[in-house]
Amino acid sequence: MIRILLLVDCANDFDRNLLRGIVRYSRENGPWLFYRLPSYYRSIENGERSILEWAKAWKADAIIGQWNDDAMDLLKELNIPVVLQNYRHRSTTYSNLTGDYEGTGLMAARFFAERLFRNFAFFGVKAVSYTH
């Protein structure tokens, strides 16, 4: 059985739908065994290092989730597939869970333009990837 460590919050709809999709995929292609760590895992003693040691002890086959950019090199020690859901930067080393942010913006602009809105704007947070 494949062991997947999930480092995903479930505080918003995107995350809950992501978890539902992962479970649905596992039912069709599994069996997979999941372990989800809560969002406070980053604040425990030794932070990401503790998670890394836990993943090794549990013999995780893959990780899906959010990870601190500053600790990205730690994941290489595991030598397993990693899929990152990172809002600040896209990883050039690992697979990314991300969206077509430009396409979404274009879709929104067309929606408003078709309704004859001529002045509209986007407000985003500079530090997150979807704003770029």
Task: Specify the residue positions occupied by each region the protein language model found.
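Short glycine-/small-residue-rich Rossmann-like dinucleotide-binding loops
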Residues: 68
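Bacterial carbohydrate/catabolite-sensing allosteric modules
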Residues: 1-62, 71-132
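Redox-cofactor binding/interface segments in oxidoreductases and associated redox assembly factors
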Residues: 65
